[in-house]
């Protein structure tokens, strides 16, 4: 009888461990899903905090006009750009190990800059975005920011 109890308890434990492992597996996002969720957060102001939570504290961001070296610095920029970015539409996404490359169109509320094509390379480690490099045509954006300073 004791043997049956032990076998029953061991069986329950194994089932419980397997169920827990399945639950953990289903809640873990892939690198591609992490980057997609991050970018989609800019489409909905209510989700932007969830997006920013996907950045590591030492996140580094580069684009042709700025270089930032922390999540805190990027959060200031994100607040500014979320006021003029109207949407991000992912056109294509590719993955190679830790690196995710995304080709997207980002819309803005700035006259003459309503549609902008960019490509951004993200490095993801341990479920967080560690760095990204955004490449886009900045000619008209530089003019826009120069006018704002005047």
Regions picked out by a protein language model, each given a short descriptive name:
Residues 1-29:
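Bacterial Sec-dependent N-terminal signal peptides
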Residues 21-150:
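C-terminal and inter-domain tail/linker signature
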């Amino acid at each position: 009888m004791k043997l049956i109890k032990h076998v029953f308890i061991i069986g329950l434990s194994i089932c419980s461990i397997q169920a827990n492992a399945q639950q953990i597996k289903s809640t873990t996002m892939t690198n591609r899903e992490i980057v997609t969720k991050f970018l989609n957060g800019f489409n909905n102001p209510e989700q932007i905090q969830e997006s920013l939570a996907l950045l590591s504290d030492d996140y580094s961001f580069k684009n042709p006009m700025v270089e930032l070296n922390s999540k805190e610095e990027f959060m200031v920029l994100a607040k500014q750009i979320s006021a003029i970015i109207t949407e991000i539409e992912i056109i294509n996404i590719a993955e190679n190990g830790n690196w995710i490359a995304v080709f997207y169109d980002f819309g803005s509320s700035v006259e003459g800059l309503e549609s902008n094509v960019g490509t951004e390379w993200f490095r993801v480690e341990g479920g967080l975005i560690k760095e990204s490099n955004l490449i886009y045509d900045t000619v008209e954006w530089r003019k826009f920011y120069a006018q704002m300073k005047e």
